[in-house]
């Protein structure tokens, strides 16, 4: 089967895409040093291409050279696969694959059948072979990494003739290693990383866009947030990346200026939605009086950026906002427990959450305790009412329980460090995965993802494992970047506990402790991938994907510093994702002006 799209059958919700003939005036304002667009769309030029037009063009281009479609496609389905896989990869890289989910699923089903037959159209081309492996594994198909074993050893690859784009595809495939025993992918990752780094060092990639793409992948592959990856790919997009002859003819016609304009405008629509959500979060923050607190981290913009970066669909606005609200609330209360509040005040917040009842102002003990409790109380009560509608049942008790659990861990950690209690690494990790906040943020926001979540699902071992693995990744990577600061504050984490446990071994260094912590994080990341990619589990894939997205946040924040507390790279990324719209390609803009 060839990849063909039916314009009439492809759903475009009002939230997902507007008519491409709409042209909104652009108004710029400045918010804390950032330019902001206040209109409903950030289209800087009028593009004479409607959604229906684009779907028609896609259907037309994908038919190929034989007008007797799809009959001709049924004759040689394997021959279409290289171009189909390149198209799927491009739709994903440019962030518009959500419009074609059913079509993509159909193609991957066909691809898997060809994979099982070891069809030459897939296996004879190294780049297509690697791409098929990656797309199928991520989708949940059982594909053995041993199929890539011929490329695992650098000695079996002609490094003088192999193209950089092909090595990139091998590198991307190697990132999907889920098992400890997948030695082929481990070897593949090692030599492709070395090869690409050497290409950068010797400045031997003449294509500037390809050079930047290699830099981007090598910088922090596990920490590429979905929408940041889309932004980067839109900036660096080049059809010549796909050089397989079968793909090139058909594919180059589709990926024209119109298609790129569609993807860029879709990005701008999502960006405008993220700006609107930031304004909502800022109003909520002020309504909760959290802006009056004189201590701790104000992470409203950070929370908005992180949620916008991992959850792109415009219709999932509630998911993003609820997730961001809980990042803010958890951070504020964590800072209170760690630095601002007295032990008694911290205990008081937990008692209030357990009782779940508003009090006269005098009974809170301090204004800060009142602000923090009422912020949680009012926010969760409102969310519980809305979640009741979404879920068709009351989930209020479950949501409150999540808050009781995380604050109980905050209290336990406060007591441990305040009393200088001896702690083993296992003791620490058994609780600290909860206090990192991933679990509460994910399960709170997931109530609004559009899927009914039963108690059986939420209380299942699978849910616990998903929460624990993603939280362990974020906790361990956070510990690696913050252990020096926490040691000065007389608190501990996994790195300091590893050092303490090996204090009698003079050869055990900080570097060794960091290496072990990173290995533990990587092990949990792979275990998380195994659960997410596995089919037939209690959680639908859309829910499980949320955990993998949050895992990328941890890899993004703590790759080389603490971007959450001291954002540097994040500030630049925030500008490009939330504040700076993409312009239509100059050629398209010129064509439009000439009409």
Curated annotation (Swiss-Prot):
Record remark on domains: The Asp-Asp-Xaa-Xaa-Asp/Glu (DDXXD/E) motif is important for the catalytic activity, presumably through binding to Mg(2+).
Any GO molecular function: terpene synthase activity
Keywords in alphabetical order: Chloroplast, Lyase, Magnesium, Metal-binding, Plastid, Transit peptide
EC class name: lyase
Main location class: plastid
Name of this chain's protein: Miltiradiene synthase KSL1, chloroplastic
Protein family membership: Belongs to the terpene synthase family.
Binding sites annotated in the UniProt record for Mg(2+) 1: 334, 338
Induction annotation: Induced by jasmonate (MeJA) in roots.
EC number: 4.2.3.131
Cofactor field: Mg(2+)
Pathway(s) per entry: Secondary metabolite biosynthesis; terpenoid biosynthesis
Gene Ontology BP term (one): gibberellin biosynthetic process
Transit peptide: 1-47
DDXXD motif (motif): residue ranges: 334-338
Positions that bind Mg(2+) 2: 334, 338
Details of cofactor binding: Binds 3 Mg(2+) ions per subunit.
Protein task: Involved in tanshinone biosynthesis in hairy roots. Catalyzes the conversion of copalyl diphosphate (CPP) to miltiradiene.
Residues that hold Mg(2+) 3 according to the record: 478, 486
Catalytic function, reaction form: (+)-copalyl diphosphate = miltiradiene + diphosphate
A single cellular component GO annotation: chloroplast
Protein's organism: Salvia miltiorrhiza
Cross-referenced Pfam families: Terpene_synth, Terpene_synth_C
SUPFAM superfamilies registered for this protein in UniProt: Terpenoid cyclases/Protein prenyltransferases (SSF48239), Terpenoid synthases (SSF48576)
Gene (UniProt): KSL1
Subcellular location: Plastid, Chloroplast
């Amino acid at each position: 089967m060839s990849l063909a799209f039916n314009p009439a059958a492809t759903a475009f919700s009002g939230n997902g895409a507007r008519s491409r003939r709409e042209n909104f005036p652009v108004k710029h304002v400045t918010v804390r040093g950032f330019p902001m667009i206040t209109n409903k769309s950030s289209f800087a030029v009028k593009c004479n291409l409607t959604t229906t037009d684009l779907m028609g063009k896609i259907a037309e281009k994908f038919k190929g050279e034989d007008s007797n479609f799809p009959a001709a496609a049924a004759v040689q389905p394997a021959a279409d696969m290289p171009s189909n896989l390149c198209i799927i990869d491009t739709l994903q890289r440019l962030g518009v694959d959500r419009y074609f989910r059913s079509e993509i699923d159909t193609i991957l089903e066909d691809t898997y059948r060809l994979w099982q037959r070891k069809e030459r159209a897939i296996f004879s081309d190294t780049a297509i072979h690697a791409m098929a492996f990656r797309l199928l594994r991520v989708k949940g198909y059982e594909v053995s990494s041993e199929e890539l074993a011929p490329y695992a050893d650098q000695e079996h690859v002609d490094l003088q003739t192999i193209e950089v784009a092909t090595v990139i595809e091998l590198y991307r495939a190697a990132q999907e290693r889920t098992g400890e025993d997948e030695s082929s992918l481990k070897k593949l990752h090692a030599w492709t990383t070395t090869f690409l780094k050497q290409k950068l060092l010797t400045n031997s990639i003449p294509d500037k866009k390809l050079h930047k793409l290699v830099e981007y992948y090598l910088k922090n592959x596990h920490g590429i947030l979905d929408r940041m990856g889309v932004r980067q790919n839109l900036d660096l997009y080049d059809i010549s990346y796909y050089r397989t002859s079968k793909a090139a003819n058909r594919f180059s016609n589709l990926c024209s200026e119109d298609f790129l304009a569609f993807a860029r405008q879709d990005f701008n629509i999502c960006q405008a939605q993220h700006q609107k959500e930031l304004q909502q979060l800022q109003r909520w923050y002020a309504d909760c009086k959290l802006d009056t607190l004189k201590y701790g981290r104000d992470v409203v913009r950070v929370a908005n950026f992180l949620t916008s970066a991992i959850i792109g669909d415009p219709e999932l606005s509630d998911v993003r906002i609820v997730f961001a609200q809980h990042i803010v609330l958890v951070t504020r209360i964590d800072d209170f427990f760690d630095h601002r509040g007295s032990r008694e005040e911290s205990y008081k917040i937990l008692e209030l959450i357990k009782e779940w009842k508003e009090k006269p102002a005098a009974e809170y003990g301090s204004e800060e305790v009142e602000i923090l409790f009422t912020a949680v109380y009012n926010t969760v009560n409102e969310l519980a009412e809305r979640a009741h509608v979404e879920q068709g049942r009351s989930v209020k008790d479950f949501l409150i329980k999540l808050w009781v659990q995380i604050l109980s861990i905050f209290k336990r950690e406060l007591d441990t460090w305040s009393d200088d209690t001896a702690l083993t690494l296992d003791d620490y990790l058994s609780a600290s995965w909860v206090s990192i906040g991933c679990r509460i943020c994910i399960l709170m926001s997931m109530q609004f993802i559009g899927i009914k979540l039963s108690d059986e699902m939420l209380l299942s071992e699978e849910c616990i494992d998903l929460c624990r693995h993603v939280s362990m990744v974020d906790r361990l990577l956070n510990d690696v970047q913050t252990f020096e600061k926490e040691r000065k504050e007389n608190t501990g984490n996994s790195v300091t506990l590893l050092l303490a446990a090996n204090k009698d071994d003079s050869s055990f260094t900080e570097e060794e402790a960091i290496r072990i912590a990173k290995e533990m994080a990587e092990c949990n990341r792979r275990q998380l991938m195994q659960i997410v990619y596995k089919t037939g589990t209690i959680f639908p894939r859309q829910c499980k994907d949320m955990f993998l997205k949050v895992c990328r946040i941890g890899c993004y924040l703590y790759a080389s510093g603490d971007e959450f507390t001291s954002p540097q790279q994040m500030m630049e990324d925030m500008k490009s994702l939330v504040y700076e719209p993409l312009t239509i390609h100059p050629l398209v803009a010129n064509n439009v002006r000439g009409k």
